[in-house]
């Protein structure tokens, strides 16, 4: 059995005037994440983990931030396209585990919606998708509320 594990990471700065979208969920907050696309830090980390597990590079290789067609892109669309490319490469996604690190806002009320979106986009049962939320205990740039980080791991199997 050919199992593949991938790890993904992303971070974006929090700025005024942008919506805060994490895991495809718009979260009420006075600031949002800065980025070329919708800056969904969680979906970007998951996308990187999936591409990495299949040895297909990273999100920037497939959806470069220099390409105008990805300006303001919905990261759920990118995640679905990633899943299609993974399938074309001969893999099925087994599960995804992820962590979002944010001092604020509280993410717990939004976790179920994030999991549902990710499961839908990856065509997985929801019990194969996990999202955790942590603070940075007020340490560093994350603890000062300057940004939000996400980490993800994905398991693929070659079919």
UniProtKB/Swiss-Prot annotation:
CDD domains from the UniProt entry: MECDP_synthase
Keyword Calcium found: no
Site positions per UniProt: Transition state stabilizer: 36, 135
InterPro entries xref list: MECDP_synthase (IPR003526), MECDP_synthase_CS (IPR020555), MECDP_synthase_sf (IPR036571)
Reactions accelerated catalytically: 4-CDP-2-C-methyl-D-erythritol 2-phosphate = 2-C-methyl-D-erythritol 2,4-cyclic diphosphate + CMP
Cofactor: a divalent metal cation
UniProt cofactor note: Binds 1 divalent metal cation per subunit.
Disulphide connectivity of cysteines: none
Binding-site residues, 4-CDP-2-C-methyl-D-erythritol 2-phosphate: 10-12, 36-37, 58-60, 144
Entry similarity comment: Belongs to the IspF family.
Record's subunit section: Homotrimer.
The protein's name in its UniProt record: 2-C-methyl-D-erythritol 2,4-cyclodiphosphate synthase
Species of origin: Paraburkholderia phymatum (strain DSM 17167 / CIP 108236 / LMG 21445 / STM815) (Burkholderia phymatum)
Lineage summary: Bacteria, Pseudomonadati, Pseudomonadota, Betaproteobacteria, Burkholderiales
């Amino acid at each position: 059995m050919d199992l593949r594990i991938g790890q993904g990471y992303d971070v974006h700065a929090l700025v005024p005037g942008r919506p805060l979208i994490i895991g495809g969920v718009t979260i009420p907050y006075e600031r949002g994440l800065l980025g070329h696309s919708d800056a969904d830090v969680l979906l970007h980390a998951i996308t990187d983990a999936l591409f990495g597990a299949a040895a297909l590079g990273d999100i920037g290789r497939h959806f470069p931030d220099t390409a105008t067609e990805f300006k303001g892109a919905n990261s759920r669309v990118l995640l679905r396209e990633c899943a299609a490319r993974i399938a074309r490469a001969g893999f099925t996604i087994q599960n995804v585990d992820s962590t979002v690190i944010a001092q604020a806002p509280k993410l717990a009320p939004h976790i179920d919606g994030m999991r549902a979106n990710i499961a839908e986009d990856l065509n997985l049962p929801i019990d194969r998708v996990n999202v955790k939320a942590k603070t940075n205990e007020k340490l560093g740039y994350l603890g000062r509320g300057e940004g939000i980080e996400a980490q993800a791991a994905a398991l693929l199997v070659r079919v």
